[in-house]
């Protein structure tokens, strides 16, 4: 699967780009997605505008409407926005690497683009299981 990465922050993301390209090369799909790293201010603005939730969040996903209509040809699943600063805070709080946190969030966003939701505990557990299964491909699964 192809991943297009855009950095709209002042943070250096080169090493994370390589990690994510490696991760998504393991996913055998003919689609692509756009990943955009944004600031706290931008993700809060997006969250407020699109979800009516006025706070900073870690990841937002916006599926490409074409992906749900097989008659329209567009290989983009959609866009995933990651707040780099929020990912840093969460990695510190959860006591794992920033690489793992970013990969976890990107995979979470990817699964939302694929139609997965977590509106209840069962759906959340299924999603987390899938995230860990994907992250295991590059040895970033949660350590027990």
Curated annotation (Swiss-Prot):
Pfam families: YbeY. This is Endoribonuclease YbeY. Binds 1 zinc ion. Keywords: Cytoplasm, Endonuclease, Hydrolase, Metal-binding, Nuclease, Ribosome biogenesis, rRNA processing, Zinc. One of its GO terms (cellular component) is cytoplasm. Belongs to the endoribonuclease YbeY family. Zn(2+) binds at residues 108, 112, 118. The gene is ybeY. Its EC number is 3.1.-.-. Single strand-specific metallo-endoribonuclease involved in late-stage 70S ribosome quality control and in maturation of the 3' terminus of the 16S rRNA. InterPro entries: MetalPrtase_cat_dom_sf_prd, YbeY. It comes from Phytoplasma australiense. It is found in: Cytoplasm. Its cofactor is Zn(2+). GO terms for molecular function: metalloendopeptidase activity; RNA endonuclease activity; zinc ion binding. GO terms for biological process: rRNA processing.
């Amino acid at each position: 699967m192809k991943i297009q990465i855009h950095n709209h922050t002042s943070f250096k993301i080169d090493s994370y780009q390589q990690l994510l390209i490696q991760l998504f090369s393991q996913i055998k799909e003919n689609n692509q997605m756009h990943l955009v790293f944004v600031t706290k201010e931008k993700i809060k603005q997006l969250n407020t505008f699109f979800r009516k939730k006025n706070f900073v969040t870690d990841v937002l996903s916006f599926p490409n409407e074409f992906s749900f209509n097989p008659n329209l040809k567009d290989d983009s699943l959609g866009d995933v926005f990651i707040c780099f600063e929020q990912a840093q805070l969460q990695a510190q709080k959860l006591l794992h690497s920033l690489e793992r946190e970013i990969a976890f969030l990107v995979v979470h966003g990817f699964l939302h683009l694929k139609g997965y939701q977590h509106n209840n505990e069962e759906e959340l557990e299924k999603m987390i299981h899938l995230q860990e299964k994907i992250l295991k491909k590059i040895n970033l699964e949660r350590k027990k």
